[in-house]
Amino acid sequence: MSKTVEPACLVPVGKVTRTHGIRGALKIFPYGESLAAQAAGERFFLRSKNGGYCTLTLIGLRAQGRMLVCGFEEIKDVNGAQPFVGEEIFLPEDRLPPVSEGEYYHYRLIGLDIVTLDGESLGVLRKIIETGGNDVYVAEREGREILIPAIEDVIREIDLERKRMVVDLPEGLVDA
């Protein structure tokens, strides 16, 4: 496995949950659909326990329920796979599939300031919960979490340049 320096913008696309089989495949929980859309030959970056990154070449993947089982050219057996359990797998930003207008990769939204139509700050978007029906944005303000449904009636504007999201919350969603 070749050690590399971190490219300018690596985006996490999944997390290694365990090894799979004696040939060193990795069982990965994907963050969205970016990982599953990749083809054999694609190069990924995995963070190793020592903090560095290894470049790995995908030789194949298959779905197993919600998980993906991925084989990499550089990992030959379970002993070679074990150090990556619990680590995230990354792609360079320019290798991600494009998104439609009005859609955003989660990593682009994390860190946005969330404000109401009246300009009241609700905090910073810290994480996104995928619920199946619609995502839920988790804003953090003064140690409290505010859950915001990611639906068109609530999310009024996303401005990535200004790092801001404007929301119109239903009455009673946030206690005073």
Swiss-Prot record:
It is found in: Cytoplasm. Keywords: Chaperone, Cytoplasm, Ribosome biogenesis, rRNA processing. It holds the Pfam family PRC_RimM. Transmembrane segments: none annotated. Its main location: cytoplasm. One of its GO terms (biological process) is ribosomal small subunit biogenesis. One of its GO terms (molecular function) is ribosome binding. InterPro entries: PRC_barrel-like_sf, PRC_RimM, RimM, RimM_N, RimM_N_sf, Transl_B-barrel_sf. Binds ribosomal protein uS19. An accessory protein needed during the final step in the assembly of 30S ribosomal subunit, possibly for assembly of the head region. Essential for efficient processing of 16S rRNA. May be needed both before and after RbfA during the maturation of 16S rRNA. It has affinity for free ribosomal 30S subunits but not for 70S ribosomes. The PRC barrel domain binds ribosomal protein uS19. This is Ribosome maturation factor RimM.
